[in-house]
Amino acid sequence: IEPDAEAYETVLAEQKEAQRFQELPQDSYLLPGFVDLHVHAPQWAQSGTALDIPLYEWLNTYTFPLESKFADLTFAQQVYDELVTQLLANGTTTALYFATIHYEASRRLAEICAEKGQRGLIGKVVMDDLNENPEYYRDQTTQQALEETERFIQEIQTLAQQTKQGVYPVVTPRFIPSCTEEALKGLGELAAKYQVHVQSHCSESDWEHQFVQERFGKNDAQALNDFGLLTEKAVMAHAGFLEEADMNLFHETGTAVAHCPISNAYFGNAVTPIAKLVHQHQVEVGLGSDLSGGFSPSLFDNLKQAVISSRMLEDGVDATKKPEVRGVKTARITVNEAFYLATVGGGQALSLPIGKLEKGYAWDVQIINTSLSQARIPKNPGESLLDIFQKILYLARPENIREVWVQGEKVHDKNLMSATKGV
């Protein structure tokens, strides 16, 4: 209802009396909650670690040893509880998670999302290739991997029935290098049988892209599609080396891209051409933090990096080349477009009614206060609402996020925390 409507004052009084009206403090603004399309949940424990080494070395020296520890449910509980709390505090109301190969720990992540009020999409990871995975961290057999995936789907769908904001099981082959053909085929069949979401990595780096070409004689996207893993509910992370045919295939199958600009800068070997994917090929794209290949849990940080990376792609980075050949024309995106990816784009990628403050969409919001003494966003008299909006996108910190709501329920309250601490 609009303030100038005849019934406005009456409706307002009724809502206040029913305690369904909350008046925001001055200099507060509502933004949709963020949708993070790519989070390696166990890797929260190593965020900010060894980002200066190649991907293959990073996985085998740091990541796989860490993820193997999630056989310990106590350790998993500690890490996952802290992660979900941190993501909510950073305005992330929906997250698409890679867990680990461990059934119990993966289920516990889903339960924590349900308990804390975050909309979580959780995948128990499959890594069954005996030759490509370390002996200490892999599925013992392909049959076991597929059976546990099916049981996980069934259990999380049952949990979802009693979870207001929703939790969702996700078919999750880690990436083609870690899986046998039998597993990839079986996972595609499970995705079709249960009509659930799918996630994996696709053409992430020179190493991964070339690995798939050598193994199958085709690009990652084409191989994944052959196994039934590109669908309307599929989200593929990175996609930095997609060719024209791959982009067309993503559009035709409805497959979305999780753009992870911070982690791509460390491990991606290239800048993903987001403007081309969205504007020329109509591929659905959202943002991902890619913890811990990306060091920050904040999509504010990632949307800024998305803009920076796109401008570097358009302008080029080799100063010895002439401007006309140095970069890629029309590759840049604006900060407004990056915000769209972090909200609406993520909702579209997941085929869920989230990411907008509109009728028919879930009430997922973050309340931003710009006038806090410890995190003040500067003002300029007479500036437009658009100017303030862009300042928030560039300058907001977790301290500015005072409240977070998911599906109409308050799940994070910085004001209450500050009052409790006497701040």
Task: Pin down the residues of each PLM region.
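C-terminal cap of metal-dependent C-N hydrolases
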Residues: 362-421
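His/Asp/Glu-enriched, well-ordered alpha-helical/loop segment
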Residues: 226-233, 274-377
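Histidine-rich, glycine-flanked metal-binding segment
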Residues: 1-31
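Active-site gating loops and adjacent loop-to-helix segments of metal-dependent hydrolytic enzymes
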Residues: 45-76, 129-142, 206-231, 253-256, ...
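Metal-coordinating catalytic core of metallo-dependent amide/deamination hydrolases
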Residues: 104, 109-240
